[in-house]
């Protein structure tokens, strides 16, 4: 039986996922988190929210792979838009991710770079292709682009401009790069799907609170369509 890991960062991001699948989930505590295990259309799915930030999402992704043996990881959640063509509730799939808060420039390394690693972390081409196929079938304007991750909630014009100029990023959040990094190191295909909840500007906090639930549901509904075809 195929095993699929499904992650969000916050409870609000996985609640619609659990509701949409509509199966009985067993709750399994591990590493300070709760993993929801169930069977959907002859696929074992493991759902969890990591809590916010790169450390938490690294722990949860590693647990999914090593303790539950998931063979694919799908991340569903919300993000802040960095570009004009990404509006509230739009969907974006990450082609690459970057840790925008990594700075070893004192040692002449480029921003985002860690020795024995790389600036950009790749996601699964096959999973992204599936996402695009589903988007075409459902007439959804799915966008592709670089997503920047860091342990800060971006809410300023200056930081937005930096992320675009330095990394050519389309959106910003706080977990995707670490999830993709863990998956890459363990050889597990990964897809990071985000729905836009704010514009990462001075009004981002208010916008995030207002649109979190709607945007999380948009991402969750699309993710379920992907699982249906895996």
Swiss-Prot record:
Pathway: Quinol/quinone metabolism; menaquinone biosynthesis; Amino-acid biosynthesis; L-methionine biosynthesis via salvage pathway; S-methyl-5-thio-alpha-D-ribose 1-phosphate from S-methyl-5'-thioadenosine (hydrolase route): step 1/2. Gene3D superfamilies: Nucleoside phosphorylase domain. Keywords: Amino-acid biosynthesis, Hydrolase, Menaquinone biosynthesis, Methionine biosynthesis. The keyword Amino-acid biosynthesis applies. CDD domains: MTAN (cd09008). It catalyses: 6-amino-6-deoxyfutalosine + H2O = dehypoxanthine futalosine + adenine; S-adenosyl-L-homocysteine + H2O = S-(5-deoxy-D-ribos-5-yl)-L-homocysteine + adenine; S-methyl-5'-thioadenosine + H2O = 5-(methylsulfanyl)-D-ribose + adenine; 5'-deoxyadenosine + H2O = 5-deoxy-D-ribose + adenine. This is Aminodeoxyfutalosine nucleosidase. Substrate binds at residues 80, 154, 174-175. Is inhibited by the transition state analog BuT-DADMe-ImmA. This compound is also able to inhibit H.pylori growth and is more efficient than antibiotics commonly used in ulcer therapy. Belongs to the PNP/UDP phosphorylase family. MtnN subfamily. SUPFAM superfamilies: Purine and uridine phosphorylases. It is an enzyme of class 3 (hydrolase). Catalyzes the direct conversion of aminodeoxyfutalosine (AFL) into dehypoxanthine futalosine (DHFL) and adenine via the hydrolysis of the N-glycosidic bond; this reaction seems to represent an essential step in the menaquinone biosynthesis pathway in Helicobacter species. Also catalyzes the hydrolysis of 5'-methylthioadenosine (MTA) to adenine and 5'-methylthioribose. Can also probably use S-adenosylhomocysteine (SAH) as substrate, leading to adenine and S-ribosylhomocysteine. One of its GO terms (cellular component) is cytosol. InterPro entries: MTA_SAH_Nsdase, Nucleoside_phosphorylase_d, Nucleoside_phosphorylase_sf. One of its GO terms (molecular function) is adenosylhomocysteine nucleosidase activity.
């Amino acid at each position: 039986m195929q095993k699929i890991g499904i992650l969000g960062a916050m409870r609000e991001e996985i609640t619609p996922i659990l509701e949409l699948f509509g199966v009985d989930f067993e709750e399994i505590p591990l590493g300070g988190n709760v993993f929801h295990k169930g069977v959907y259309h002859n696929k074992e799915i493991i759902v969890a929210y990591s809590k916010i930030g790169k450390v938490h999402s690294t722990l949860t992704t590693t647990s999914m792979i090593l303790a539950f043996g998931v063979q694919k990881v799908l991340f569903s959640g919300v993000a802040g838009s960095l570009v004009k063509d990404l509006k509230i509730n739009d969907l974006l799939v990450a082609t690459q991710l970057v840790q925008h808060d990594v700075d070893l420039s004192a040692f002449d390394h480029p921003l985002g770079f860690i020795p024995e690693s790389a600036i950009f972390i790749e996601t699964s081409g096959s999973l992204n292709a599936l996402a695009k196929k589903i988007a075409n079938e459902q007439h959804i304007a799915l966008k592709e682009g670089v997503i920047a991750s860091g342990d800060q909630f971006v809410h300023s014009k200056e930081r937005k401009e930096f992320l675009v100029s330095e990394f050519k990023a389309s959106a910003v959040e706080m977990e995707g790069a670490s999830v993709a990094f863990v998956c890459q190191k363990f050889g597990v295909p990964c897809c990071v799907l985000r729905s836009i909840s704010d514009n990462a500007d001075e009004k981002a906090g208010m916008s995030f609170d207002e649109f979190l639930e709607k945007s999380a549901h948009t991402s969750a509904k699309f993710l379920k369509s992907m699982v249906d075809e895996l």
